[in-house]
């Protein structure tokens, strides 16, 4: 892997080459979209630094970088709901990663839901945005799992 601090490779090499050369942002992160390998549903969007990306590739389990906690974390380290990576892809610019996972425990979201995307943006009668719960059934009680 190549860090963003290294010399910039040619655009053609980034878009068409076979070398992994992730383009980390100023904070040293790439966006990661995680989907359920079976259903194709989006489970979550998170971030990876170089270490999280490397650990994910090497271990076959999803690792992320928490911007709020400012630390590396393995998905499922507290809940047991690990994500086994079945496929990883990187986009054309190599600045975003997509991983397809087998989600243990049936829930990816820290709220106990299958997906972090459990609210749809609709409009009320006056045209104002309104959030509607969809696919919002909890798979686990976050208070019991995380002790909040």
Curated annotation (Swiss-Prot):
Gene name linked to the record: hisI
Pfam family, one: PRA-CH
E.C. numbers: 3.5.4.19
InterPro entries assigned: PRA-CH, PRib_AMP_CycHydrolase_dom, PRib_AMP_CycHydrolase_sf
Subcellular location: Cytoplasm
Organism: Rhodopseudomonas palustris (strain HaA2)
Pathway: Amino-acid biosynthesis; L-histidine biosynthesis; L-histidine from 5-phospho-alpha-D-ribose 1-diphosphate: step 3/9
GO term, biological process aspect, one: L-histidine biosynthetic process
Annotated positions binding Mg(2+): 91, 93, 95
Domain of life: Bacteria
Cofactors required: Mg(2+); Zn(2+)
Protein name, as recorded: Phosphoribosyl-AMP cyclohydrolase
Subunit structure, interactors included: Homodimer.
Matches recorded under Gene3D superfamilies: Phosphoribosyl-AMP cyclohydrolase
Catalysed reaction equations from the record: 1-(5-phospho-beta-D-ribosyl)-5'-AMP + H2O = 1-(5-phospho-beta-D-ribosyl)-5-[(5-phospho-beta-D-ribosylamino)methylideneamino]imidazole-4-carboxamide
Role according to the record: Catalyzes the hydrolysis of the adenine ring of phosphoribosyl-AMP.
């Amino acid at each position: 892997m190549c860090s963003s601090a290294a010399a910039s490779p040619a655009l053609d090499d980034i878009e068409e080459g076979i070398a992994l050369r992730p383009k980390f942002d100023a904070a040293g992160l790439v966006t990661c979209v995680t989907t359920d390998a079976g259903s194709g549903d989006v489970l979550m969007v998170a971030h990876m630094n170089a270490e999280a990306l490397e650990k994910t590739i090497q271990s076959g389990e999803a690792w992320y970088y928490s911007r709020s906690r400012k630390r590396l974390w393995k998905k499922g380290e507290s809940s047991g709901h690990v994500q086994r990576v079945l496929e990883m892809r990187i986009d054309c610019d190599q600045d975003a990663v997509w991983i397809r996972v087998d989600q243990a425990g049936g829930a990816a979201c820290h709220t106990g839901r299958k997906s972090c995307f459990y609210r749809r943006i609709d409009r009320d009668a006056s045209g104002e945005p309104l959030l509607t719960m969809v696919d919002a059934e909890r798979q686990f009680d976050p208070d019991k799992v995380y002790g909040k």
